[in-house]
From Swiss-Prot:
SUPFAM superfamilies: Ribosomal proteins S24e, L23 and L15e
Native organism: Ignicoccus hospitalis (strain KIN4/I / DSM 18386 / JCM 14125)
UniProt keywords, alphabetically: Ribonucleoprotein, Ribosomal protein
UniProt key word Ribonucleoprotein: yes
Gene that this polypeptide is encoded by: rps24e
Protein name from the UniProt record: Small ribosomal subunit protein eS24
InterPro entries according to UniProt: eRP_eS24_sf, Ribosomal_eS24, Ribosomal_eS24_CS, Ribosomal_uL23/eL15/eS24_sf
Disulfide bonds: none
Family that this chain belongs to: Belongs to the eukaryotic ribosomal protein eS24 family.
Superkingdom as given in the UniProt entry: Archaea
């Protein structure tokens, strides 16, 4: 797992989607860009929620700076996540969950 710092730039509640939407800046100077799995885990840890309820929808690295902009959604329940997120994002999220479960064993 790479070392990086997470800074919350903007945090807003979306009542229609029943989720919290976060704009993040990841600082990883002289380190590779963190994976979606690592970011989901770190955000869940920061907010004290289950990792399965956090979805990283966007990662955009800034060349040569060691900084990445990210967007994450934090849901109140898993059913809402399944209903609203696009298939591509859900697939990436499931791969992260499976990889973390395999690591735990």
């Amino acid at each position: 797992m790479s070392e990086f710092e997470v800074q919350v730039v903007n945090k807003r509640w979306n009542p229609l989607a029943e989720r919290e939407e976060l704009d993040l800046v990841l600082v990883h100077v002289a380190k590779p860009t963190p994976s979606r799995c690592e970011v989901e885990e770190k955000v869940a840890q920061m907010l004290g929620v289950d990792k399965k309820l956090v979805v990283v929808t966007k990662l955009l690295s800034e060349y040569g700076i060691g900084r990445t902009r990210a967007r994450a959604h934090v849901y109140k329940n898993y059913e809402r996540l399944q209903k609203l997120e696009p298939e591509k994002v859900k697939k990436l999220h499931e791969q992260c969950s499976q990889a973390q479960e395999a690591q735990a064993q």
